Regions:
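Short amphipathic beta-strand starts and helix->beta connectors
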Residues: 20-28, 121-124
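C-terminal regions of mature proteins
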Residues: 43, 77-145
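M16/insulysin-pitrilysin zinc metalloprotease superfamily fold
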Residues: 8-9, 29-87
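Aromatic-anchored, glycine/proline-accented short structural segments
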Residues: 17-20, 31-33
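His/Glu-based metal-binding/catalytic segments typifying zinc-dependent metallopeptidases
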Residues: 1-12, 16, 41
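Active-site lining segments that contact anionic ligands and/or coordinate catalytic metals
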Residues: 22-24, 37-39, 133-136
Length: 145
C-alpha cells in the first residue's frame, strides 16, 4: 500500500515523472522479502535514471516530513482492497493465493483482514523506519553498443 501511495499510477510522483518525460508506462515498483532481508525496487525505462532516483528520494523525504494525505490513503486502501476482490474472479489467482497462503500458514482471506487494519499512522511509521538514502543503490542496465 505504501509503495502505491509513493509511486502508483495515480501518485503525484508518477504523474510528475511522466510529465517530465523521465519515465514511460513501464515504470513499476515491488517489495520483496526473505529470511533476514527485505527490499524495495523501483524499475523501468528512462533516459535519465539519476533524475528519476532523485525524484523518488525527494518524494519519500516529502512524505516522511509531511505525512500521508488521508484522502490519498483512503483511495489507495479502497483501490487495493477492490483489486483483491477482483482477484477472486480468476481461478488461477485463487489457486496461487491458496498455495501461497498455505505455505505462509494463513488462509486465503487473511490479507482482506490485514488491509482493514492498516492506518495512515502505521504507514507513516513504516516509512520513517525504512527507505533510507544510505541503504539505496542505483543500478542501470545499458544497451550493448
Amino acid at each position: 500500500m505504501l509503495l502505491d501511495i509513493i509511486a502508483g499510477q495515480s501518485s503525484a510522483l508518477y504523474k510528475r515523472l511522466l510529465e517530465k518525460g523521465l519515465i514511460n508506462t513501464s515504470f513499476s515498483y515491488e517489495y520483496f522479502t526473505g529470511f533476514c532481508y527485505s527490499a524495495v525496487l523501483f524499475g523501468g525505462e528512462s533516459s535519465d535514471p539519476k533524475a528519476v532516483e532523485e525524484e523518488i528520494k525527494k518524494e519519500i523525504a516529502s512524505l516522511k516530513a509531511n505525512g500521508i494525505d488521508r484522502k490519498i490513503f483512503s483511495r489507495t486502501q479502497k483501490k487495493l482492497y477492490g483489486r483483491m476482490i477482483m482477484g477472486l474472479n480468476d481461478i488461477d489467482e485463487i489457486a496461487n493465493n491458496m498455495v501461497l497462503s498455505y505455505f505462509d500458514g494463513e488462509d486465503i482471506f487473511t490479507d482482506f483482514e490485514v488491509y482493514k487494519t492498516i492506518t495512515p499512522e502505521y504507514l507513516e511509521e513504516l516509512l520513517k523506519n525504512s527507505m533510507e538514502n544510505e541503504y539505496s543503490v542505483l543500478s542501470v542496465i545499458l544497451p550493448i553498443e
